[in-house]
Amino acid sequence: MGTGDFICISMTGGAPWGFRLQGGKEEKQPLQVAKIRSQSKASDSGLCVGDEVVSINGNPCADLTYPEVIKLMESITDSLHLLIKRPTSGTSEALDSETENTNHQHLPHGGPMESTTLQIQHAAKTQGKDFLLASVQTSAPRTEDQGNAWGYAECTTEDQVSQMPGSQEGHLVEEVILRKKPEAGQPGHVVELQLSLSKERQRCTSDPIVTLLGNEKFKSPDPDWGTQHGRTVHINSIPAPEKADTSLTSGTTVQTSSGRELTVIQGRDPGGTGLPQVEVILDCSDRLKAEECRLQAGRGCVASPVEGGRSEAPPSLVSFAVSSEGTEQGEDQRSGKDQGRPHKHRARHARLRRSESLSEKQVKEAKSKCKSIALLLTDAPNPNSKGVLMFKKRRRRARKYTLVSYGTGELEREEEEEDQEAGDKDEISDLAFLGTSESEVDEELLSDVDDNTQVVNFDWDSGLVDIEKRLNRGDKMEMLPDTTGKGALMFAKRRERMEQFTAQNEEEKTGGLAGGGSDALQTDGLRTMTSYQRKEESVRMQSSVSESSFQMGRSLGSVPQQNGFSGVSETAGPQRMIPMNRTAKPFLGSVNQTAAPFSPTQSVTSPIPDFPAPPPYSAVSPPPEAFSRGISSPVAGPAQPPPWPQPAPWSQPAFYDSSEQIASRDERIAVPAKRTGILQEAKRRGTTKPMFTFKETKVSPNPELLSLLQNAEGKRGTGAGGDSGPEEDYLSLGAEACNFMQSSAKQKTPPPVAPKPAVKTSSSSQPVAPVSPVWSPGVAPAQGPAFSTTNPPNPPQVTAVSSIKIAQPTCPPARPASALNLAGPFKGPQAAVVSHNYTPKPSAPTPLVNAAPAGAGGPSNELPGMSGKGAQLFAKRQSRMEKYVVDSDTVQAHTVRAQSPTPSLPASWKYSSNVRAPPPVAYNPIHSPSYPLAAIKSQPPGAQASKTSKKKGKKPLNTLDVMKHQPYQLNASLFTFQPPDSKDGLPQKSTVKVSSVAPAMKQALPPRQADIGSPTNAKASSVYSVPAYTSQPNFFAEATSPVSASPVPVSVPTSPKQETTSTSYFVAPRPKFSAKKSGVTVQENWRSLSLPGRAAPPIMSAPPWLCQPAYSYSSKPTLEQEKANKRPTPWEAAAKSPLGLVDEAFRPRNIEESIVANVVSAARRKVFAGSQEDWKERLSFVPQTQKTSMSFSERREYNVPSPVNSHVSSHSLYSSQLPYVCYRKESRNDLKAMSMDTRSEYCLPLGGYDYNPHPRGWRHQP
């Protein structure tokens, strides 16, 4: 072609176009491109320097001057179409793309398309051809006009990127439709071609993209060709097959991804014009491709349903190049360009698109755009570009999670593609690692895993490796015929695990409870491991909670104590989820186990530790007789079920143990495991007893106690019921709520925790304030209703109790049960003993006033089966509060005496921060039985001192690091508030009966002298038989006087062990501290004391009445002395001392005090000079000797010299005392230790008979 190649270049987007023109008519030079800016639209479109511009947007440029051209260019705002003439040296290789692609499903459809119409007009006067360009949409069928003579050339472009079998480069797809429109009636034919043009070739326009040579005729036009333009497939230029016909050698063979070929061959058509032909070989498979090419090439042309076959055209050579800009802009710009082309063309295209609606146009445009974008992503020019990699990653993820097969991540290939791959492709074994994570590495590995690869699926969560072989068609998993993929495997595994766990749980439920303590430990470990797998189990367990609880109850009864838990060890393991008072454990089990008489109670008791019984302070307390009987008989029948209602199922460990068990990470994520630990426990507590874990025996609950637990009003009712209500209320608020319990409590009577001076007055004025001693609630809860239930029916022990019984049953004990319950809470025989001691006879009911205070105090001290951190903290804090709420008189009276937590030890030694830690048993003074009873609310003098110390308490706590975790305990230990009278009055051996005695004393208290004299009171004191050293009996008496003014008759177990228990209880009557102290002290006491009943003492802890100091009768003289000789409170002393010592608070203030201290010390040395046995006996009697001047309550205590009762009472009095007692027990014989004890005792300036030379700490525990 002598004139060169004509190229149509389209640019869109508006100026600047990026090229400069030169020449023009005035210069008599053709208009040429002088310069092209790099990376500009002109450069991208393939415009080259030196190209001659024939027309601009259809306006011929031959007659235009340069200014006119510039003006014309400036008028173009959107799209620029240039027809340029480029010299060429010959024919160029042809690139053509077939529009029909049977595998078009794999390729994105639609995309921006730009259509340009090139009209080639033959003019007689010119050898060249004029080209008119206009935008046209190619979506409309164009083959309708294929029969038109002399058509026009229409060039359509669209951006598409496809995955070429052997190509990494992106290709610009152009639909180039060449149509020649007739002019002046000249005949002609229309040739339509769809071309795929690579961007590289576009830029190198010197090498023409498409070369059409010769006449071609469409024999079989496809009327729907326009609708199939989306099927365009990208092609790669390849050399003509060697096996192709020789006629192909003169042309170029182009193979598309679908296996089609476009060949441009030199041939002769029938007219002999010597024009080339264009052939398209369709649907050539790998095997038949050569044959078909050969055959079709031999024929010279092939009927193409897409291309329309062969047609003739006037001889011409036209090369088309389309800019990339045009392809990017898409149809948006050509949709409105119809006005730019000749009217005849618009009319024609309007006719073609008449059937299209606007929505259809939009849909097609969107498709074309999407196709163009998708092609760019799937066959990007730079496959390593960030955008392409991201797209692939997202695509893999989408495939992985959009399949129906639970997310295997394997994309099922199309049948056609599989057929192709199955052809000549060798099978390749690839390993793709499919994990559960979403990491990029996993996704990369997952990318495009073919069906013929082996997929190794690692389920890292389950730790199992599942190998899934996927060959050509992808083998389905045998194990899961219906579903496939990682998800299916995960669910199958989960099913198996859940079945295993269910079977294990069933086995454990049926026979697991019979194991020993070691088994329990193992159970704990297993439970920890499988805590996250409890989902299904919890529901089932809830339904079976009652059953399991009964089973546990039986097992508890039968199982020997372990870890200090009697019979509970078996169930304790499963139940350990519920925090328990570890310190109290030994008391619970060992004491119960040791005391033969308590064995019946043991079975009940052991369940009690595990399942906190409802507040022992039930509305109805069993008769003291029953308690005494149960306690007195060492070999009692099997423990009766606790009278209180059984704890809610949540309190039972089994309930929690059978928790759901979730197997894998995915499962855990989908179904969060049940919360465990403190949070779970708190949730269980819910609204009922949030701070306490009440482990109830599986025995049928006592209807009365059950009503107390279930009825909030009943709990808040007068007497013990009040204890339960406030307890729950404040527990729900938290441990600190106990500080406000007294004020917030809605009890009709003041809570035992904070006996008011008025209460004290009432006690002194009304001998019959049979309200359970404030301490009794604490004691009773410690005991647990089990004892009350077991013992109440037995009136025989009333004799023992009778001594304790208060002669003034002014009013039936509103909740005497509180006292009984106090004894009941003790899990062991001691607990039973305590209950007996504290249980007032029905005949001598305690006044509601006492019961109410007891109830108030009970929450902290009286919680029956209270265990766990929450219960401990609450009890400790409440006791601390009570200590500070003591009547001012009582506090003062008791502050007068040395405030040593362990009377046996000197205050300095006891309070030394260093010393505190060493005594394992009495590490916490508050927990020790020696803990000053005066510290409890009952002491009026203690109240003042406690208030003072309360203000300063936090400082001393800071100073004393040892107790930093339990500052409140430390506070209690610092205050050995015990009126001298109560000290003297309480014999060491006084038994738990002291609780009864205290009420009796309080009844007589109004006339304190009379109380002392009253035989009943004396008898009660005997029952108390608190060790002489224990001033606490006095405190109990005092404390009892206001609240327990009407002493609750307490049956004291006659068994020596019971005595010991009661004694310990009596010794450590700290109603406020009973819960915490009893727990801690109990352990200590248990160690020091071999009594099995110690476990119970922790529950009994300090009976409120015991804890309360003797009232004014014993403390008045002390009060006066104390006022006269005011010494710093233990808190003040600790605050002043750099070491936190409180010696200053206990040192003699004057000569009188010094003399008294010396005398007391000497007396003690004499008393304790003998062996422990002698010493024990002396202790039991010494208080009597000293009690001559002591208060009636003290005298009563002394009156009960029975070593057994004394022992039990001392034991039960205050389990917390036991630790100290035990500790001192070793040093009791030691003069030095005794001197220390005396030091704490004598430091109190108690010249009066109220002074108790034998502190609790001195009491000897057998």
UniProtKB/Swiss-Prot annotation:
Residues 554-560, 602-809 are annotated as: Interaction with YWHAB. Keywords: Cell junction, Cytoplasm, Cytoskeleton, Nucleus, Phosphoprotein. Residues 999-1018 are annotated as: Interaction with ZYX. Residues 331-341, 353-363 have a biased composition (Basic and acidic residues). One of its GO terms (molecular function) is protein-macromolecule adaptor activity. CDD domains: PDZ_SYNPO2-like (cd10820). A motif (PPPY motif) lies at residues 614-617. Residues 808-1153 are annotated as: Interaction with FLNC. Residues 477-658, 659-922, 899-1153 are annotated as: Interaction with ACTN2. The modification Phosphotyrosine is found at Y617. The modification Phosphoserine is found at residues 304, 323-324, 518, 543-544, 546, 549, 558, 599, 606, 621, 700, 724, 772, 776, 900, 904, 908, 1014, 1055, 1090. One of its GO terms (cellular component) is actin cytoskeleton. The PPPY motif interacts with the WW domain 1 of BAG3. Has an actin-binding and actin-bundling activity. Can induce the formation of F-actin networks. At the sarcomeric Z lines is proposed to act as adapter protein that links nascent myofibers to the sarcolemma via ZYX and may play a role in early assembly and stabilization of the Z lines. Involved in autophagosome formation. May play a role in chaperone-assisted selective autophagy (CASA) involved in Z lines maintenance in striated muscle under mechanical tension; may link the client-processing CASA chaperone machinery to a membrane-tethering and fusion complex providing autophagosome membranes. This is Synaptopodin-2. The lineage of its organism: Eukaryota, Metazoa, Chordata, Craniata, Vertebrata.
